[in-house]
């Protein structure tokens, strides 16, 4: 016992011993109910090293004993009728405060302690700055190699759009593209593939192959439009707007409202179509039938029947220049009229013009007959003279 304990009265000493026993019993009972000590209520204390925990346990037990003695002494000085549970609550509160202080100190120490990774990479910044271009190249080469061996570098689908007369299967077959082909190979030969398709199909005027991420290709097709028909040997053929004549005959019952050229050869067809496509739609829609009517002065003279009842006569070589004047002329005349554009522009009723042509044809026939008669008479005279000469 301490000197203070010796100064106590026998009753006080017994009471002190009783309180100590009660405190120990309460402590044991608390340990039995709560496996973890009060100062372990913080998660920090659980993570401490074993040596630190033992040190804290020893320190806490010493402090608890001192606090217990001080509490008993204080209570004895103030009052001898205090209850043990009140003292225990004060001790527990003080122990919890000590635990919180220890946790705060440990957190501050952890913040100040340098990280293992920071010490590992300390001083490596200059080296990384020098090496990053090489590292970037290596990464790009690696990613590129992975892409080249992956299915994404091969074409997955090839589609065709804009085609009305040629099937998508035929266009895809003409392109030569297969699903196992490399995307880069197709991109490098893109223009060549487009030209091949255009040459294979006369109806196709232009082809554009577009790439769609990640590995799809689309051929956008633009086709030639239908321009006119040409009739040869009682068969009708379609002519495209580039002057190309489709060799397959067209059903006469399924003709569109397009001009029909009578017995034009391929060169004449192309010349007519080139001029025809420059005209306004209003004029083109009036033209129905085109025939060749050559004259002595104009060998490429043609007659164009119009849906308004008039007929235009113009040279094939001047079609694009002269025909645009027709609408203004048609407003000033009453159909049916013949608008002659061979030498200037003048109009004549169709019946009178036909009579004029008939008279002209008769005169021409008579002239030809007279010339033939003269040739016959001259031939007869020559024969008679040669006979007389031989008899002499």
UniProtKB/Swiss-Prot annotation:
Stretches assigned to the Cytoplasmic side: 1-131
GO cellular component: cell division site; plasma membrane
Key words of the record: Cell cycle, Cell division, Cell membrane, Membrane, Transmembrane, Transmembrane helix
Region feature (Disordered): 1-88, 368-392
Feature: compositional bias, Acidic residues: 58-76
Transmembrane stretches, start-end: 132-152
Membrane topology recorded in Swiss-Prot or TrEMBL: Single-pass type II membrane protein
Bias type Basic and acidic residues, positions: 14-32
Main location: membrane
Extracellular side: 153-392
Compartments, record wording: Cell membrane
UniProt xrefs under InterPro entries: Cell_div_FtsQ/DivIB_C, DivIB, FtsQ_DivIB, POTRA, POTRA_FtsQ_type
Coiled coil, from the record: none
Gene Ontology BP, a term: FtsZ-dependent cytokinesis
Domain POTRA: 153-224
PROSITE patterns registered for this protein in UniProt: POTRA
Sequence similarity: Belongs to the FtsQ/DivIB family. DivIB subfamily.
The protein's role, per its UniProt record: Cell division protein that may be involved in stabilizing or promoting the assembly of the division complex.
Protein name (Swiss-Prot/TrEMBL): Cell division protein DivIB
Species of origin: Lactococcus lactis subsp. lactis (strain KF147)
């Amino acid at each position: 016992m301490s000197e203070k304990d010796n100064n106590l009265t026998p009753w006080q000493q017994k009471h002190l011993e009783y309180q100590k026993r009660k405190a120990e019993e309460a402590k044991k009972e608390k340990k039995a109910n709560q496996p973890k000590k009060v100062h372990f209520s913080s998660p920090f204390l659980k993570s401490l090293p074993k040596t630190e925990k033992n040190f804290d346990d020893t320190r806490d037990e010493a402090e608890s004993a001192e606090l217990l003695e001080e509490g008993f002494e204080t209570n004895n000085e103030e009052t001898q009728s205090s209850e043990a549970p009140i003292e225990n609550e004060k001790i527990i509160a003080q122990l919890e405060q000590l635990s919180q202080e220890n946790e705060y100190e440990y957190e501050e120490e952890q913040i100040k302690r340098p990280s293992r990774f920071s010490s590992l990479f300390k001083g490596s910044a200059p080296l990384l700055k020098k090496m990053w271009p090489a590292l970037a190249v290596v990464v790009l080469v690696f990613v590129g190699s992975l892409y080249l061996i992956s299915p994404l570098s091969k074409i997955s689908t090839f589609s065709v759009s804009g085609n009305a007369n040629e099937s998508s299967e035929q266009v895809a077959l003409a392109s030569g593209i297969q699903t196992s082909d490399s995307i880069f190979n197709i991109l490098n030969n893109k223009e060549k593939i487009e030209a091949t398709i255009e040459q294979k199909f006369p109806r196709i005027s232009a082809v554009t192959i577009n790439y769609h991420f990640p590995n799809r290709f689309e051929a956008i097709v633009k086709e030639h439009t239908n321009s006119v028909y040409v009739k040869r040997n009682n068969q009708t053929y379609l002519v495209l707007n580039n002057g190309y004549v489709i060799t397959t005959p067209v059903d006469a019952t399924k003709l569109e409202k397009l001009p029909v050229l009578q017995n034009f050869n391929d060169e004449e067809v192309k010349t007519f179509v080139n001029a025809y496509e420059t005209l306004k739609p209003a004029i083109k829609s009036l033209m129905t039938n085109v025939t060749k009517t050559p004259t002595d002065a104009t060998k490429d003279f043609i007659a164009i029947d119009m849906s308004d009842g008039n007929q235009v006569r113009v040279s094939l070589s001047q079609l694009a220049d002269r025909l645009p004047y027709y609408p203004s002329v048609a407003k000033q005349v009453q159909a049916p009229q013949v608008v002659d554009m061979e030498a200037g522009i003048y109009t004549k009723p169709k019946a009178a013009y036909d009579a004029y042509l008939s008279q002209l044809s008769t005169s021409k026939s008579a002239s030809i007959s007279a010339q033939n008669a003269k040739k016959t008479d001259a031939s007869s005279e020559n024969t008679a003279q040669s006979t007389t000469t031989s008899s002499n």
